[in-house]
Amino acid sequence: MRPEDMLGGAPVGKPYIRTRDVFQTDNDNGVEGYSDEALALVADTSKTGVPENVNAVGMAGSAKHGTIAVQLFARVNPETHVIEQAGYRAHGCLAMIASACAAVYWMEGKTIEEVAAVSADLLAQARGVVPRDKSYTARYSACAVRGVCGDFFVRQGATFEDMLARPHACDDASLDCVLCENCSLRNSMVDLEIASRLRAAKEA
């Protein structure tokens, strides 16, 4: 493609969403295959960005389907564990944007413990219909939600052993984990395991 065929990093004639918090990279088929519910989430900018006083962050992404990434941010009440406000940043296709926004709406008002029971199917239902070859995006959002849960407890001082006992602990044999090349919860678990092994070695 020639430089003169580009405008602001997107091909001329093809509308792309490009903001500080949302970066659309795929627009081959426009909105074909998306339900009205999913497109409404894409158009909803009220949940983009980082809320004030965030104390839990989760991230998941992969380059297996192009550069796909989602970051979720939450302000969690430390006493009640209720997620009072959440926001997101997304990089990828419209389905990824819709999945991220759906995750934020689904999280708000729930406790961290309730949110830890997230599944890709739950978020897919909340998101609405997307093209079949984009259905995996709900899995990235589910991983990012688990990352929010894990990050909250790590910031509260949870150890590797504490995290393993929780329902949102990493399951590296799960399909979600296999799909995600980058996962903030997995990274945190690795760091905690290293710290645990070092402590055990010193005490031996």
Task: Give short role names for the model-derived ranges.
Residues 62-66, 75-139:
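Active-site- and interface-proximal helix/loop "cap" or "latch" segments in soluble metabolic
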Residues 54-55, 61-69:
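Active-site cofactor/cluster-binding pocket
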